[in-house]
Amino acid sequence: MRAVCVVGLGLIGGSVLRAAAAAGRTVWGATTADADAVTAAGFDVLDLDKALKRARKEDAVVVIAVPLPSVDGVLRKIGDFAPRCLLTDVVSVKGPVVEGVARFAPETRFAGGHPMAGKSASGWAASEATLFTGAAWVVTADEDTALDAWREVAELAIDCGAGVVPTTTQEHDAAVARISHLPHVLAAVLAACGADGGPLALSLAAGSFTDGTRVASSRPELVLAMCEGNRAALLEAVDDALGKLGAARGALASTGALSATIRAGHAGRVALDAYRAAGQAQAMIDLTAGDPLEELRLIGAQGGRIVGFDGDLALATLPVLPD
Amino acid sequence: MRAVCVVGLGLIGGSVLRAAAAAGRTVWGATTADADAVTAAGFDVLDLDKALKRARKEDAVVVIAVPLPSVDGVLRKIGDFAPRCLLTDVVSVKGPVVEGVARFAPETRFAGGHPMAGKSASGWAASEATLFTGAAWVVTADEDTALDAWREVAELAIDCGAGVVPTTTQEHDAAVARISHLPHVLAAVLAACGADGGPLALSLAAGSFTDGTRVASSRPELVLAMCEGNRAALLEAVDDALGKLGAARGALASTGALSATIRAGHAGRVALDAYRAAGQAQAMIDLTAGDPLEELRLIGAQGGRIVGFDGDLALATLPVLPD
């Protein structure tokens, strides 16, 4: 099993370090915070240059787990000290990471990653080896992704307990704009509209407002880094929301009828619940035949996951929705 | 203690019947569903005409607890059989109820009500005597509301375990548009935008999307009745949301910066949390001096509640926010 060098040991990076170690891999990390606590937990912490030199020497996979604004700086170091390493990341937005890799570490063998797991607490102290158990973990399969790099990164994600969702950088960013970044923007809009109603409105707020504004309590800096980093895709999602809300406004003003809006929303939520309640079918993809990356992307597009490998076969599960 | 006649014995009406009985009041009801179950639970169920005749004879307070589209029909019956009764309702939107009262039962002594309690299950089977414990319960105090009617309805709400929020019909409808109806519209828009992302997006949806779309799983007919019944106030709230979302769109497209949007939303949610964590100061309102209805409305405008009466004094609590 390939060794793992994790750069950035907050909630996600720390959990990758712990999970990969629990899977039996040799691990070490670099961090700008909590180094003593990581060491006290029994893990090797090196400064970034040394961590990357060791990655080159031991042919480790390097996992970038720093916030997006710090990614390019880490990539420069990788270009200097481990320029041909196997590389992935666990940063939310994928487009800017791909651009940074092309610019600063173009000779690495890269497949981007995004584990869909988290919790409200942050930092090393909140990290845990089981954070990814059962979670979806995107590993990007673009036209120019090397199949062996993709597979090795997918194996790391599976070792950490996750199921792997193969998709492109662009499709990932478009999807998370809709289901992760747009929810933050709409929660902020709703919270501001409610607060504009003054103490009377807040005193009457019940579950619908509480749920709809929950993520507005997240630290603004984190939300901004996430949303602004996915600017182009989020703009499309916001335009979609503006169009739908504008249609609701028009219907309310003209006929007073919100049926199309409310029923489309109900259908959307029912689709989510149906997806989550779906049965699972098994499928296998031969990684030696045809266009395996395209086959893998089709699994992701259908809401499926890669859950393991058997020789040259990738083992997949696909949701089976009731008719 | 005045007897209570509840018309409509679903979740809310059934819970009023149970709570008022538990407070020691004589109660009976009328219902189009579950009459056998209500009787089996030990309560008197009459047909609507007889229930209202008994209300007239025993000088009971009549509580309208039917869905908004059925309110006018009940009001006609009240005009026929108990035209001068003390009257309230527990329907969400207040404007259309006030209009119906003026048209069909203008001689009743009316103060509108809206208990801010509920749960996802509906119907008599879901009702419980403790549903309103600690909840806010709006009792409308308009310019033409009779103080003694307001007080008696408030006493019923307090007997049911709630704290009473005094405000006007118009201010109530504006507030619930922001904190109850707009959340449903935005949840519907978000759910539709997410589902438009297909199975890939649904497979990546985590907490922010799940929370933000939770109320989109409500029965569309109930949501439509609620939202469409509050058309004018909801239109204002939707316009506010459209303006804020449009501003976010413009900022994202021009500078890419969402700071104003995200920080205003964070401040709004912080205001909600601060309100809920606030300490409580006591206040008293002399119902025999000055303009007591205006004093009561000021309590509601400050996020306060009436929690009891002592002779001619109304006892209030007001939130005390940390500086």
Where are these regions (language model features)?
Chain A
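NAD(P)+-binding Rossmann beta1-loop-alpha1 motif at the extreme N-terminus of oxidoreductases
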Residues: 1-54
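Glycine-rich, N-terminal phosphate-binding loop of Rossmann-like dinucleotide-binding domains
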Residues: 65-67, 91, 141
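Internal alpha-helical scaffold of NAD(P)-dependent oxidoreductase catalytic cores
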Residues: 131-217
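Interdomain hinge/lid region at the active-site interface
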Residues: 200-273
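NAD(P)-dependent dehydrogenase/reductase Rossmann-like domain
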Residues: 245, 252-254, 258-323
